[in-house]
Amino acid sequence: MAAIPWRPFNLRGIKMKGLLSLLIFSMVLPAHAGIVIYGTRIIYPAENKEVMVQLMNQGNRSSLLQAWIDDGDTSLPPEKIQVPFMLTPPVAKIGANSGQQVKIKIMPNKLPTNKESIFYLNVLDIPPNSPEQEGKNALKFAMQNRIKLFYRPAGIAPVNKATFKKLLVNRSGNGLVIKNDSANWVTISDVKANNVKVNYETIMIAPLESQSVNVKSNNANNWHLTIIDDHGNYISDKI
């Protein structure tokens, strides 16, 4: 979850305006539990007309949220992003300790039918004014949640234990090349050489692609990978 300066938006056009001026008299960071997204990833099977995402306001005051989907380019404002999804509602007010469902519906598209496509769901939580802030100049910070959205064409298997059979590891110089022969995006949290973790960061490999990985050591007789399945579980196996 990232904290960003809140930028007010036009509810009619849902257009983001400029950043608040930094020339302010005070900056207030109120305690606010905020809105959370249930789950760590969204799988959208092509045969589904829509999928529902559950949000929860864990704060003790109501919050205003703005939700949108992007294709990985975070430089564009929401109103300029073009993705083949309709999200309802894009703006909503959630009461304290209350939930809200957001519906994602696929639109006519030209997405690949032989492999998954990746997008991202963003939820911007705009905190309310506290009684202490009323009438004061304050910089409010909005909290943004962003999780992966995988669009899965018909006939493509889920990410599970069988996915390991589609992963190949080869030495390359001082590093490794991991080949993903599956039609899924695969997220690898751990690469272990002789049961010692050697990767520096989480790796995400596109379907039917290979990726070079920097590791602390590639001198091993066997490799164990830990991947994240459809449900956000960490599963490991020997490669």
Curated annotation (Swiss-Prot):
A GO CC term attached to the entry: outer membrane-bounded periplasmic space
Highest rank taxon of the organism: Bacteria
Traits of the deletion mutant: Deletion of the operon under classical laboratory conditions does not result in any major effect on E.coli capacity to form biofilms compared with the wild-type strain.
Pfam families the UniProt entry points to: PapD_C, PapD_N
Entry annotated with the keyword Cell inner membrane: no
GO biological process: cell wall organization; chaperone-mediated protein folding
UniProt function note: Part of the yehABCD fimbrial operon. Could contribute to adhesion to various surfaces in specific environmental niches.
Family to which this protein belongs: Belongs to the periplasmic pilus chaperone family.
Protein's name according to its UniProt entry: Probable fimbrial chaperone YehC
Organism: Escherichia coli (strain K12)
Gene: yehC
